[in-house]
Structures are given as C-alpha cells and as structure tokens.
Amino acid sequence: MNLSASGVSADKRYYENNEQVSKPADFMVDSYDLEFNFRNDLNAVATIKTDDFKDEYKFTLYHGYKISKITDGNNDELDFARDSDYLTIKNTSKSKLIKIYYHGSCDKYYSNYLSVFLPGNFAFYPIPGFNEMYSTHSYAGFDDLSLPYETDFNVTVHSLKKVQCNLESSTNNEFKGKSDSLTLLSGFINCVTINKTQIYYPYFNDAYNSDTINEKLETFVSKNPNIKKIFIIPDVNLEDIEFVKTFNDYMITASIDDIDRLGFVSKISANKMELYDAINAYMNYPEYFEFLKTNSSEELQKAIPVLEEILKNDNDGKKLEKINDYLIDNADDRSFSEFLCELRWLYVKA
C-alpha cells in the first residue's frame, strides 16, 4: 500500500496512457458469492451466477488484481483473456456459474490486515461488461461502477479486524443482502445511529464524535429515509468526484459538512462536473466565474455566455431546476451548449 500522492497518482498516469473501453453487458448477475482474505493484499474468490448462458462473458476488474484461474460450476478451468481492466471468459462448458480466483492491490483503495477501504464505486470484484473505470475529464478520478440494478450478495471476509459493510451482517464478517454495489471498510471505526440510520466514522479523527455527527446529519437523515447507512471515509488523496458517492440505500462521504450539497454532487457524472463548477462559481465566486470564461474547456467556454444569460433571468429558480435535472440525468448526453440553447429557446417560446 502506497498512500503517498505519487503512489495514488499512479492510477491517473496509468489511465492517461491506456485506452478505456465501454461495452454494456449482454447478461445480468443473478448473484455474487464473494470470499475475501485480507493479509498483505487482497486474495479473493468470486462465484458469479448469471441470468443467461453466454459463449463469452465480459467483466471489468481493476488491473491491479491478477487472475490466478477461472472455473465453471463443475470446477473445470475456463480459458480467458485479460487486457488492462477488461476480462473476457470463454464459456466452453455452457455454464451459468463462473468462479474467478484473483489477488492483488490498489494504492488508493487499499485492503490489508491493518485496514480496508473498498468503496462501492470501485471494481474490486468483477463488474459485468466493459466499463470505463477512471474519468479523464476535467474532473479526474474513479467513476461509479455500481450496477444499474440490485442483485443478491453473499460475502465472507477473512480478516484480523472487524469489517463494516453496506449489507446486513449475518455473523462476524459475513454479510448478505440485495444491493447495487458492495462497500467494505475496516480500521478504527465507531458507529452512531440516528433515526435507524447507522453512521460509521473514524474515531481517531477529532472532527467526528456522536454529538457533531448528530448535529450535522440529523436533518439530512430525516429527509432521506432510504439511506440506511452512511460511511465517513478517509480523505486520503481523493479526487473531487471520489469525495462522495450515493448508492441505492447507502452513502459514502469524506465530509459531513454541507451534506445536502454533497449528496446532490455525488449524482453528477464526471463529464458534467465542469458545468456544475461554473454554476457554483456564478452564484458564489464571481471572480472565479470570470476566470472560467477563458480558462476552461472549449465546450464550457462555448456554453458560458448562454449559461450566464439564463441565470441572470432566472427570477423564480425554475431554469436552475431544469439545469440541475440535466446534471444528474446520466442518460442525457447532450453537450452543455446543446442543452442550454434548448433551455433558452424553451423559455423564449413560453
């Protein structure tokens, strides 16, 4: 584990020099049976049941994890090809059950006998399809690879320390449940409960105690009853887009200050963060907004005059609501200018 800035930035250099691929899966995962052994690094066995037989299965698994072997449901070995984060399995046995044995580490998202930080946005277990793991937009960092659906997880962890998980614990370090992702965390962790929501926090950090957490999170928890657990994670060389992530029923965050805003920001994809930054600058930091007019991407510079015109005439806040909807709609792939020009025209006609 190398938590220095140079060690963690190795991923940024890696993805700047290695092409990423996006190819949606043509199957779904019915269930994960995951076994993790934390010693000097991570050793894992992932047993995956798919919803349909395929001649070939494609998965994404972080390149720092090396594959020892892959077998089918009868423990017969299957051929596979590995290229960076991308794994292709030749399913010659016509099985819907696949077992992947792997080991390794990641500097940023570490896992060893002392502590574990494996968040749900990170492919530390095989994710269906080929996915772009790391954003190389203006806001760089590991993007969200949670599933677009919930599936069954059965997780067993072998560790010298107690491990916390977004799933419910059946026995010590064993977890079960349905989710769109998996998060594992261990170290010096305490837990406080607010209105049935469990908040896990590092007790060695003086910024966090039960009183402070209650004060800053009570309102947020009451407004978001779907959030069952909140994990306050270590801010160790995290990029902006890694700072907070919201999943179906839990949240990970490196701060609890201004948690409502952070919760909203966590839903914005990396390719739209630059527009959010410009909106925030217009509303709160006018000098920085002027700076962005000539010191930002070509796409944002083209969009800024339209954005400024819209916000200047947004007396009732309805245009900002439309912009916020666009920011968190990952299916809306219009460019900044396309969206803003259409929004301006919509209100001109009205």
Locate predicted features.
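Short, well-ordered beta-strand segments enriched in hydrophobic/aromatic residues
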Residues: 42-52
